[in-house]
Amino acid sequence: MAYVLTETSAGYALLKASDKKIYKSSSLIQDLDSSDKVLKEFKIAAFSKFNSAANALEEANSIIEGKVSSQLEKLLEEIKKDKKSTLIVSETKLANAINKLGLNFNVVSDAVTLDIYRAIKEYLPELLPGMSDNDLSKMSLGLAHSIGRHKLKFSADKVDVMIIQAIALLDDLDKELNTYAMRCKEWYGWHFPELAKIVTDSVAYARIILTMGIRSKASETDLSEILPEEIEERVKTAAEVSMGTEITQTDLDNINALAEQIVEFAAYREQLSNYLSARMKAIAPNLTQLVGELVGARLIAHSGSLISLAKSPASTIQILGAEKALFRALKTKHDTPKYGLLYHASLVGQATGKNKGKIARVLAAKAAVSLRYDALAEDRDDSGDIGLESRAKVENRLSQLEGRDLRTTPKVVREAKKVEMTEARAYNADADTAKAASDSESDSDDEEEEKKEKKEKKEKKRKRDDDEDSKDSKKAKKEKKDKKEKKEKKEKKEKKEKKEKKSKKEKKEKK
């Protein structure tokens, strides 16, 4: 017998086909082109109803993942009695999972079976007694919404999409602000060129334009809210002796409009930066404590989500953002990059050139731990203690490599464990002699280490001298070889010239 397993929003339906070899039919589409033919071909053999919406969601997820649930297994055992029967299923993964159960029937899932399912889905309400088309549609819609919610796992505090969009917008704002500020300085620079050299901050420059207007009003304009007293005096002095040209009121209006845009963009950028910082502390507090808000947000945006970044190994996190350099290095067989986006982290920035790669590797390892705690820990809090501890360890490692104290992060004070009081021990006089012996042993160990270091230095020096000698000997051999080749060339040339002279002489004598 041939059975067709149909998954509906109401439950599992097991349909019995009248034709044993229906899945081998060449004219299947013509055989199942009407409801009468479908009803004639298939009869319902068993139906396992879902008890609730939660049960329906659980079963649907099992089918999507290619797993056989206990409810489905119970239904399949009903056709176990029919020997040499065939079960037609829609998914290949599900077919493989059913085969592993060891039931006594053949499981089929191929391109031909899709036509069977297409016909069954079209006339499904007629095949299931007591089920109307409207009821099935409502159930399907409810189940679709449940699956969607399950996949999204929506939580207002866990939406990393907000971080991805915020960091992308922040980068765009920075580019726009730089472009607008440059254009504003070039435009207003025709009227007051000295101002750009005195005031380097773009926002302060735009605010001065809005407050002062034309440079002739500088002396009577109060700029104390924008600039310090010394710089304000310099601006006013420069305005009196400026080399700039005069501009019309129309020009100034357009410059003011651009300056207003710069001030508004800067205010919105600051607001967006604060929003991003708050989001990062809510979603990835440990990563934020370790690498900072901006670097952490860029890592999440580059990988697509917090979960996918947490699944990445430390080696991937280390070079994330340097993919082009990595593939170019692999193609040309050169050294691979040591860091990507992590280069902009403050801890990597504190290291000198030779230690940047080592610190990037340590930082990537600690970032991987922090990310997994942020993304996957069930009982995590938003204090970021793991990130602070990891940062302290990276700073200690950096201090060891640099040979100077660079530690800035305070130690995380955790709640002390309860200590049980025991009876105090009496003074042991023998311990003094043991201590003295251990001190003498440590002194002897130090002497042995010093001897080893001296020996290693001597060996390194000898190797260096040997290398230099070998280089000199190679150079001498090369020079000797070159001289020999030159000599041989010269001899050949002389022989050739003699031969030519001789032949010329013989020709003359013949004449």
UniProtKB/Swiss-Prot annotation:
Please list the residue ranges that the record marks as compositionally biased, kind Acidic residues: 440-450
Instruction: List residues of the Nop domain.
Output: 283-403
Chain segments annotated as coiled-coil in the UniProt record: 435-511
**Could you mention a single GO BP entry for this protein?**
rRNA processing
Skewed-composition ranges (Basic residues): 454-463, 474-511
Q: Which PROSITE patterns match?
A: NOP
Protein name, as recorded: Nucleolar protein 58
Q: Which organism is it from?
A: Saccharomyces cerevisiae (strain YJM789) (Baker's yeast)
Taxonomic path: Eukaryota, Fungi, Dikarya, Ascomycota, Saccharomycotina
